[in-house]
Amino acid sequence: MATATSHQSVVSFASLRSSPSSTISQCGFKIDSSLSFTSKKTNFCKIKAMASSVSYDNTLLSPSKTIPDNSQKKSNEAALILIRHGESLWNEKNLFTGCVDVPLTEKGVEEAIEAGKRISNIPVDVIFTSSLIRAQMTAMLAMIQHRRKKVPIILHDESEQAKTWSQVFSDETKNQSIPVIPAWQLNERMYGELQGLNKQETAERYGKEQVHEWRRSYDIPPPKGESLEMCAERAVAYFQDNIEPKLAAGKNVMIAAHGNSLRSIIMYLDKLTCQEVISLELSTGIPLLYIFKEGKFMKRGSPVGPTEAGVYAYTKRLAQYRQKLEDDSEVLCA
């Protein structure tokens, strides 16, 4: 497995925005119906290796969102938390879910709450989620457990009217809130004609080898669906354009999303190869912590619990944040 300091090539996203295989639709994209059961090979099975662990390549950012030079010079440190949503109703039923919008099970709700307890002492300034309810439920339930007790508020920018109607006019209330930004680009991989089918029955119908290829290969999509490679195109591009600039500015970010969109982002952060990422498994409701500093991502694993000493020993800033929470709590109890 590649480490955070290796310089292996992974996937190149030079042509992300001009991919001919997808266009935006209700689920965020529409898969070209010309896709077949065979691989639709593309040129970007290699991510550009960078001089630092993860550094900026401004050619991949849109001009309006290019990170200013002064933000790159700052030595801001920021936390990045990744959480796969809790168990969904279709996870429980062993169905292919993809972009079908199904809620959490009771177990999934408990997983989201437990995830929140694990990160309750880690600062969060902004939350990104997919546009799917299971990821949004996970984000909201997790943040309810945070010791700062700030209220997560979903931002609606789908229209000017939606923006106006959901406006908050109290500065005090705004200061006690955390913005939640939904993005279809963080949605689960679209499973095409497999969505809603039972996984076991699908294996019996098409053969175990064929279904395994659809599910675990990097560049072979299911019928009229996305490959992991195609999912990575949109997820990593969104991360580079919208999330990395927040981290560079010192904002602490949480992402609540899905197995394949998060695997894509981790592939980028950890510089995994195409072969390494297909064996990466993410459990539901388990948070992963990264520290972003001086243009580099440092993987810190998963917090075992809110009082795990190791999480706060990683950086002086996290230790100070936790101590402030303790001091504030003592003042309130006095």
Curated annotation (Swiss-Prot):
Localization per Swiss-Prot or TrEMBL: Plastid, Chloroplast
One of the record's GO cellular component terms: chloroplast
PANTHER family for the chain: PHOSPHOGLYCERATE MUTASE
Keyword Plastid: yes
Catalysis: reaction(s): (2R)-2-phosphoglycerate = (2R)-3-phosphoglycerate
Swiss-Prot/TrEMBL keywords: Chloroplast, Gluconeogenesis, Glycolysis, Isomerase, Plastid, Transit peptide
The family this protein is said to belong to: Belongs to the phosphoglycerate mutase family. BPG-dependent PGAM subfamily.
Protein name: 2,3-bisphosphoglycerate-dependent phosphoglycerate mutase 1
One Gene Ontology biological process: glycolytic process
Function: Catalyzes the interconversion of 2-phosphoglycerate and 3-phosphoglycerate.
Active-site annotation: 85, 188
Binding site for substrate: 84-91, 97-98, 134, 188-191, 199, 215-216, 259-260
NCBIfam families referenced in this protein's UniProt entry, alphabetically: PRK01112.1 (NF002217)
GO molecular function, one term: phosphoglycerate mutase activity
Transit peptide boundaries: 1-48
EC number of the protein: 5.4.2.11
Site entry (Transition state stabilizer), positions: 258
CDD domains according to UniProt: HP_PGM_like
Biological or metabolic pathway of the protein: Carbohydrate degradation; glycolysis; pyruvate from D-glyceraldehyde 3-phosphate: step 3/5
Lineage of the organism: Eukaryota, Viridiplantae, Streptophyta, Embryophyta, Tracheophyta
